[in-house]
Amino acid sequence: MNPQRRRRLWLVLALVLAGGLATTLVAMALQRNVAYLYTPSEVLRGDAGAHSRFRLGGMVEKGSFKRASGSLEAQFRVTDGDAQLSVSYDRILPDLFREGQAVVATGRMQHGIFVAEDVLAKHDETYMPKEVADKMGSAHRKHDVPAAAGQVGERQ
């Protein structure tokens, strides 16, 4: 093999290795930033990793909201109809946040409490994120909730 071909071969090998390394790094970064959606039942069953970041979806349980006096820290429970999970949040809650409404919170579990970094409330009375609607719909079917109460996830 002459020297020019050998240099080209090394260049091609270096480019292939650099491309593979870049692809691996991008895939690892994306995997770390992905936050899967779980319901309280799935979290308590252990489906979400013990220290992983994930989204918690469900309804804010009526009568569960408490705010610490003189602080932004709020405590509430999210339910999917089967289980409830306590949530702690120390930032300003969305204007549409209220008990009995759908919510999606992003955060991690710490000592049996979901510590939220971000909380999203549904934005009108008929819409619910599709992932939450699907999971809540299966809970409704399990508990024989009438179809009208389970029709969420689409605009009318």
Curated annotation (Swiss-Prot):
It is found in: Cell inner membrane. Heme chaperone required for the biogenesis of c-type cytochromes. Transiently binds heme delivered by CcmC and transfers the heme to apo-cytochromes in a process facilitated by CcmF and CcmH. The chain crosses the membrane at residues 9-29. It is a single-pass type II membrane protein. Belongs to the CcmE/CycJ family. This is Cytochrome c-type biogenesis protein CcmE 2. One of its GO terms (cellular component) is plasma membrane. Residues 30-156 are periplasmic. Signal peptide: none annotated.
